[in-house]
UniProtKB/Swiss-Prot annotation:
Its main location: cytoplasm. Keywords: Aminoacyl-tRNA synthetase, ATP-binding, Cytoplasm, Ligase, Nucleotide-binding, Protein biosynthesis. GO terms for biological process: prolyl-tRNA aminoacylation. It is found in: Cytoplasm. GO terms for molecular function: ATP binding; proline-tRNA ligase activity. It catalyses: tRNA(Pro) + L-proline + ATP = L-prolyl-tRNA(Pro) + AMP + diphosphate. One of its GO terms (cellular component) is cytosol. This is Proline--tRNA ligase. Its EC number is 6.1.1.15. It comes from the Bacteria. NCBIfam families: PRK12325.1, proS_fam_II. The lineage of its organism: Bacteria, Pseudomonadati, Pseudomonadota, Alphaproteobacteria, Hyphomicrobiales. It is an enzyme of class 6 (ligase). Homodimer. It comes from Parvibaculum lavamentivorans (strain DS-1 / DSM 13023 / NCIMB 13966).
């Protein structure tokens, strides 16, 4: 993509309304623009990141055996009355009346709708287990939306739901999603720590939040330091094998947010040199809710004994749009964003130091075509801005590689390659630079 033809409305100054780094940098980098309180338009650069994150989430869900569908944003209030949540949910729910005076709502979550879809299609234990997910926009009318996409009113979520005949089956589904989440976040360049979360009236141990460490996190977190760099299962993971060892390696070590923190237990279980106290951001949550919805909404299956029983359900959420902000909170510096490779909107920022110079233009065009032919996403700054502005802009948007081409380097047969994450610069031949970028 040529910058001269791209839509990238960057800002030179920090927006006054931005309180945290991710909000400030997303606005400055031209990723989003606010259209109303807590509601954002996603501009091309931001949308590119959003799609990369979606792709990773989708890939890992399918790898773990989940099946994708797409549910609408608008839901009938009747479904929520069946579950008993319509009147109880509160003012966060946006309630709508259509032209036929029917009560509708803009879905803040999808338990009722997925249960309705399931109960209309599945009647026998032979059709179990099932794990269904979708990636869809949601709306919650937060009283004080703030921090940009981190706590907005409209947001993109991955919602998944498992359906099993019994609790043991539900545990297997839960373990698969636990591992799937570890892999998803690791692929995004994040070190996500699973922490025991509230299970509500159901009880048990099947509720975990996935937290990434960031100075501006909304929660205080306390954990064993070894959890931060613990290895994540590789591509050869078999989800049909026993996943307990992978999970136990994490859940056996202390990890809690301030809501669940037990200071005495922390000191007793974790050596002082291994204690980590920090701030964290929740990016995912998985939990088992048993028959809470299947019982009240009549999602029943006939078991092997011929008797009807309500299915056991689990819920698995990832904040897709929130992850964009969370990644920036975890990976930025004074100059701007530092994107992990897997979620970067472009892999390379190609900088022409002297647009209009025939030799420099030709060299840039040649490299641009070669990178593009290899399937590498390139943002080519072919504008006539001064060099300093081009460098600042590329640092701000945080692409993993910066490839700089100018008349002086071309005379000696070299280009400059900069790694954004480390700031390391190298003078290389064009061929060597291309090889390094290609990996």
């Amino acid at each position: 993509m040529r910058l001269s033809r791209y839509f990238l409305p960057t800002l030179k100054e920090n927006p006054a309304e931005a309180q945290i780094a991710s909000h400030r940098l997303m606005l400055r980098a031209g990723m989003v623009r606010q259209t109303a309180a807590g509601i954002y338009a996603w501009l091309p650069l931001g949308l590119a990141v959003l799609r990369k994150i979606e792709g990773i989430v989708r890939d890992e869900q399918k790898r773990a055996g989940a099946i994708e569908l797409l549910m609408p944003t608008l839901q009938s209030a009747d479904l929520w009355r069946q579950s008993g949540r319509y009147d109880a949910y509160g003012p966060e729910m946006l309630r709508i009346v259509d032209r036929h005076e029917r009560d509708m709502l803009y879905g803040p979550t999808n338990e009722e709708m997925i249960t309705d879809i399931f109960r209309g299609a599945v009647r026998s234990y032979r059709d179990l287990p099932r794990n269904l997910f979708h990636i869809q926009w949601k709306f919650r009318d937060e009283i004080r939306p703030r921090f940009g996409v981190m706590r907005g009113r409209e947001f993109l979520m991955k919602d998944g739901y498992s359906f099993d005949l019994d609790v043991e089956g539900a545990r297997r589904a839960y373990r698969k999603m636990f591992v799937s989440y570890l892999r998803s976040f690791a692929r995004m360049g994040l070190k996500a720590i699973p922490m025991a979360a509230d299970t509500g009236p159901i009880g048990g141990d099947m509720s975990h939040e996935f937290i990434i460490l960031a100075e501006t996190g909304e929660s205080a977190v306390f954990c064993h330091r070894d959890l931060v760099d613990m290895a994540v299962p590789g591509d050869d993971i078999d989800y049909e094998t026993d996943l307990n060892p992978v999970i136990a390696a994490r859940t056996d070590l202390y990890a809690a947010t301030d809501e669940k923190h037990d200071a005495a237990k922390f000191d007793a279980e974790v050596p002082k040199d291994k204690q980590l106290s920090a701030r964290g951001i929740e990016v995912g949550h998985i939990f088992f809710f048993g028959t809470k919805y299947s019982q009240s909404m009549g999602a029943l299956v006939t078991g092997p004994d011929g008797k009807e029983v309500p299915v056991q359900m689990g819920s698995y959420g990832i904040g897709v749009s929130r992850l964009v902000g969370a990644i920036i909170e975890a990976s930025h510096d004074d100059a701007g964003i530092v994107w992990p490779d897997a979620v970067a909107p472009f892999t390379v920022g190609l900088i022409n130091l002297k647009s209009g110079d025939a030799e420099t233009d030709a060299a840039c065009e040649s490299i641009y075509e070669k990178l593009t032919a290899q399937g590498i996403d390139v943002l080519y700054d072919d504008t006539d801005e001064r060099a300093g502005a081009k460098f600042s802009n590329m640092d701000l948007i945080g692409l993993p590689w910066q490839l700089v081409i100018g008349p002086r380097g071309l005379k000696s047969g070299t280009v400059e390659l900069k790694r954004r994450a480390t700031g390391e610069k190298e003078e290389l031949s064009p061929e060597a630079a291309l090889a390094k970028i290609a990996g």
